[in-house]
A protein has these predicted regions:
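Glycine-rich nucleotide-phosphate-binding loops and adjacent flexible coil segments
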Residues: 1-142, 147-177, 183-185
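C-terminal regions of RecA-like/P-loop NTPase motor modules
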Residues: 31-34, 60, 64-78, 83, ...
């Protein structure tokens, strides 16, 4: 299981869709066919909101890279989520949405199941996991696990243990977003100590990731390097980092635990959550630890 932690209202879903779900859904076999299926169980975003995020991610990462799949040849078209919510779409955005909806309708046919569950019930979730795993849904997205009261701490602990057990018994790949504890808000360095009842989740997670916004002034005080394959070495990219443009934000991704690779890494991304788009800038060092033990 992969655990992805961030504070409330900090675009957890908007990041996870293009970073994790889209690559799975776009994975092709040797014949170029897509088979991977995803079961989504959510308690905050309903299906309409989620599919809007999915559509914008497809526009950013599929439409703009494979234009021959669509009815026009113009590069780098985007649609603003704000324009969708406020019913202010331009003619170009309307055309783009029509194209991507047709593409998604065919591309995701019988490959995505969405279940909205306002209050997570471990027994009910287990029932859905078992039901859909028999239908080939081996990838699961749980959005969002959170604990704000003592009773919810116990629920999250039980849910974590159930997800670990069922995933191992049925060979499932599970990604679960986790809301970080409010009393840790303001921390610069994020890790498992930012989660209420952290032990129950971190013990079962194969990978633990944490995510927060970072101001350009803070970035200037850090070292940022990126591996240059042409030179076969890391090079400094701090001087190339620009001030964020309209609707853009810089985000830090903390790799706290990784049983399959390097951990204790911090990656800097430039993101636009209005268009559901991001790009990696480099690896960060020089950030002092300011948390618990």
């Amino acid at each position: 299981m992969t655990e992805f932690g961030a504070y409330s209202g900090t675009w957890k879903t908007s990041y996870c869709v293009p970073m994790f779900l889209l690559p799975i859904l776009n994975a092709e076999d040797e014949e170029g066919k897509k088979h991977e299926k995803i079961l989504i169980i959510a308690n905050e975003q309903n299906k309409e909101v989620f599919m809007t995020i999915m559509g914008l991610a497809y526009i950013s990462f599929v439409l703009n890279r494979h234009r021959n799949e669509f009815s026009y040849e113009t590069k780098n078209r985007y649609v603003s989520r704000k324009h969708i919510n406020e019913n202010m779409l331009t003619d170009e955005e309307k055309e783009t949405l029509i194209d991507v909806k047709e593409y998604i309708k065919e591309d995701l046919k019988n490959r995505v199941q969405f279940i909205f569950m306002p209050s997570f019930d471990p027994k009910e979730i287990e029932m859905y996991l078992l039901k859909y795993s028999r239908m080939g849904y081996k990838n699961v997205f749980i959005d969002t696990m959170k604990a704000e009261t003592k009773g919810e701490y116990h629920l999250m602990s039980n849910l974590s243990q159930m997800l670990d057990r069922v995933s191992k018994e049925n060979n499932l790949r599970i990604l679960a977003t986790v809301q970080l504890a409010l009393h840790t808000y303001g921390r610069k360095y994020l890790d498992h100590t930012c989660i209420a009842e952290a032990k129950s989740i971190v013990e079962v997670a194969e990978v633990s990731l944490y995510f927060r916004e970072v101001e350009i002034s803070e970035i200037r005080s850090l070292s940022v390097q990126k591996f240059d394959y042409s030179q076969n070495k890391y090079i400094d990219v701090q001087s190339k980092i620009e001030d964020p443009k309209y609707n853009e934000k810089y985000m830090l991704l903390f790799i706290g635990k990784n049983r399959h690779g390097k951990d204790k890494k911090i990656i800097l991304y430039r993101s636009n959550f209005d268009k559901v788009w991001f790009t990696e800038i480099g690896e960060v060092s020089g950030l002092s630890y300011d948390g618990g033990k």
